[in-house]
């Protein structure tokens, strides 16, 4: 854009912005704001400033436009204007402000009953906040997944679910990841995506075993038997064998099972967990990043047995003394 055209757009924007400010305020002669006319003025001003790349003024006008539209009870348009204001904040490198405005837009979408748009906007805000506030990012992504499922927009929820679960696992929030996988299973059932359902079920059981909770893994396995296709699937068979191996403290069995190619088709984070899954030499329970070999496990068992045998003569001697 030439300097002359940019100057003209700036002048145009300033003119309409002043008009919008005037119409949206009351005075001694105007007891009620003219929101309709103010909205038209702010929209023209915002577009003019945006064309001239005067982003701070454009952001102000989009915010005022959203306010006008809220007073006019057109919440969908108010949400779109708030999104535009967020885009201007992004141009200004105001990351936190950009995310905050997206969340305000999300509220307006939800007020209007647009859960899908709210979830999509929430996902955008979460991505911006990942390096600023991890906990808020995870909460926003989780809420977005729930909104997608609530609005029956299951076909559009896959990427958000995948991104959120992967992030939860990356930051070792295993309980939250499992909860979200259980929610995602409902989506897979609705969409009749049995293959993805089976992978999700195996992932849940793998993570449960990795967090020392064999009881939970058994509970989940019983729950997943409600899916008729799971028990006959390769994932279902693998899950059952893995639980049995842990139940029997079969170190070699666990190593052989987790080395199967099937785990490579799970989420990358789950595949990493599965690769390092083994039985702890100390507690005989599954642990993440445990590398206890079978020989150590055998030595531990032998030591325990020997200690028990060594204690028996002493106990017998005490008993004999009591009799005497």
UniProtKB/Swiss-Prot annotation:
GO terms for cellular component: cytoplasmic vesicle membrane; phagocytic vesicle; SNARE complex. Residues 299-312 have a biased composition (Low complexity). Residues 285-324 are annotated as: Disordered. PANTHER family: GAMMA-SOLUBLE NSF ATTACHMENT PROTEIN, SOLUBLE NSF ATTACHMENT PROTEIN SNAP. Belongs to the SNAP family. Interacts with nsfA and probably SNARE proteins. This is Gamma-soluble NSF attachment protein. It comes from Dictyostelium discoideum (Social amoeba).
């Amino acid at each position: 854009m030439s300097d002359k055209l940019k100057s003209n757009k700036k002048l145009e924007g300033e003119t309409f912005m002043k008009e919008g400010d005037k119409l949206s305020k009351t005075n001694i002669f105007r007891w009620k704001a003219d929101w309709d006319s103010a909205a038209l003025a702010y929209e023209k001003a915002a577009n003019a400033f945006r064309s001239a790349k005067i982003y701070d003024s454009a952001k102000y006008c989009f915010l005022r436009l959203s306010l006008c539209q809220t007073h006019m009870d057109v919440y969908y348009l108010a949400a779109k204007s708030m999104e535009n204001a967020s885009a201007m904040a992004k141009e200004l490198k105001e990351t936190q402000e950009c995310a905050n405005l997206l969340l305000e837009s999300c509220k307006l979408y939800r007020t209007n009953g647009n859960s899908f748009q709210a979830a999509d906007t929430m996902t955008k805000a979460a991505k911006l906040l990942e390096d600023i506030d991890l906990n808020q990012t995870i909460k926003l992504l989780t809420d977005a997944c729930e909104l997608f499922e609530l609005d029956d927009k299951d076909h559009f929820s896959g990427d958000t679910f995948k991104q959120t679960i992967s992030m939860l696992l990356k930051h070792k929030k295993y309980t939250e990841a499992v909860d979200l996988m259980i929610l995602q299973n409902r989506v897979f059932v609705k969409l009749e995506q049995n293959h993805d359902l089976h992978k999700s079920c195996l992932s849940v059981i793998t993570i449960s075993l990795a967090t020392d909770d064999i009881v939970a893994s058994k509970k989940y396995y019983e729950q997943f038997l409600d899916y008729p296709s799971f028990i006959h699937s390769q994932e279902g068979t693998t899950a059952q064998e893995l639980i049995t191996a842990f139940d029997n403290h079969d170190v070699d069995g666990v190593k052989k099972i987790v080395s199967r190619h099937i785990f490579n088709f799970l989420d990358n984070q789950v595949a990493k967990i599965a690769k390092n899954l083994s039985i702890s030499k100390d507690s005989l329970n599954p642990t993440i990043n445990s590398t206890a070999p079978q020989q150590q496990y055998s030595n531990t068992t032998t030591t325990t047995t020997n200690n028990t045998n060594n204690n028996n003569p002493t106990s017998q001697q005490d008993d004999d003394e009591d009799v005497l």
